Amino acid sequence: MLANHDTAAQLLSVIIETGEGGLIVVDGGWTNNTDYVLNQIKQKGGHVQAWLLTHPDSDHVGALADILYKHNGEITIDGIYYSFAEDSWYAEKDPEVAKMVAYIKGAFGLVPQNILHGDIVSGQVIQAGPARIQVLNQAYKMNNDFVNNSSVAYMVSLNGTNTVFLGDLAKSGGEQLMADHDLSALKCDIVQVAHHGQNGVGYEVYKALRPSVALWPTPQWLWDNDNGGGSGSGIWLTQETKNWMVRLGVNANYCIKDGDQVIE
């Protein structure tokens, strides 16, 4: 899980090595993270078997867009997987995100169309070498926190370990995910805490997943709930999520405030 080496902003950027020379990438970060992400992929062999997108916020899909615009052909991508709502929905709900949707769709036009899989559905299984990826939902259209709640959740199973990525799912999206799946049956080992560790899914989602390890795509200021006035000065709910992880007995927390996080 990559930290933001370019700004202090939050992001979600994960590279999974499948062990057979291939990679799975989850989101990737901002446009200004492009060079770092690209170099990390190249250092790991340059072959992305599956690039998974949770939702089209700039801090998640910007880097992929600019890799396709500015570095097309420098790495191999076998498949890009995503579920977006209609352009008109983003235009109505969040014009800034609508701009990013248009931007990344423009980038999609530069690659072979057979690698684009924008039609993923709940329950679909994607094979990436020895890794098995389960799509847990299509983009939800909730009546609040619209774009975050449209996040696709994925479970990546590799070497006997199940990792659930929640993207930026918020409370109602998490409730819908619980309605759609028996989350306890997923046998989750590792969870990416939703929405950078605050104001994401509710406690019941984590309780059902019962992870032993938590991945925090959370910069220092957000971890500390620091709006510039010191620890605890902000309005973010990070401490609540930390408390949940303690209640659930999570025994390891990996956070990008400490730099790139490697789990082997």
Annotate the PLM regions:
Residues 207-208, 247:
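Solvent-exposed polar/charged
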Residues 27, 166, 193-194, 217:
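Thr-Gly-centered strand-to-loop micro-motif
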Residues 26-30, 48-53, 87-94, 140, ...:
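Second-shell loop/turn segments in exported
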Residues 1-46, 113-185, 262-264:
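Core dinuclear metal-dependent hydrolase active-site scaffold
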Residues 74-148, 213, 218-264:
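Binuclear metal-ion centers of metallo-dependent hydrolases, dominated by the metallo-beta-lactamase
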Residues 19-22, 31-82, 181-198, 210-215:
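Active-site metal-binding motif and surrounding structural segment of the metallo-beta-lactamase
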Residues 9-10, 31-33, 56-62, 86-90, ...:
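Active-site environment of divalent metal-dependent phosphoester hydrolases
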Residues 37-39, 64-66, 94, 177-179, ...:
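Short amphipathic alpha-helical segments
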